[in-house]
């Protein structure tokens, strides 16, 4: 009986080690940085292009990436947050209408990711990062003018449960004060 138990434990440990090795082999993908077309030379136009297309690679609904709770569309959450911080700096450097258009475009793209695959965490993670950076009172990047359009759309989004929609509607109203 002891031999059978020892053999069973050995097999379980071996299988566990093989599975751990497979998990260790995966590494996060780099953030898909956007580059302005070379024909755009004006610095303001470059900033506008970048702010509008910043998230295209990450939020492409056709993008295939490994599903992992530590990643957003295959990119580490830390990298996504750093790129979000960089993007918010660019938002402040462009005209307000361009910034709002970019925020709305991001919302449309994360919703498209959610429609394609509800198991994807892109919608949830990007919405959480948006709130953390642009609405948290302790965030040095807090900007209700940029958060307002996003949260207003969250308040009407089919992928948000009714209770949270009401909370988002309240936040959207607070952003307009």
Regions found by a protein language model. Give the residues of each.
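C-terminal motif of bacterial Sec signal peptides marking the signal peptidase cleavage site
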Residues: 14-16
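Sec-dependent signal peptide recognition
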Residues: 2-8
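Oxidative protein folding and maturation machinery
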Residues: 18-177
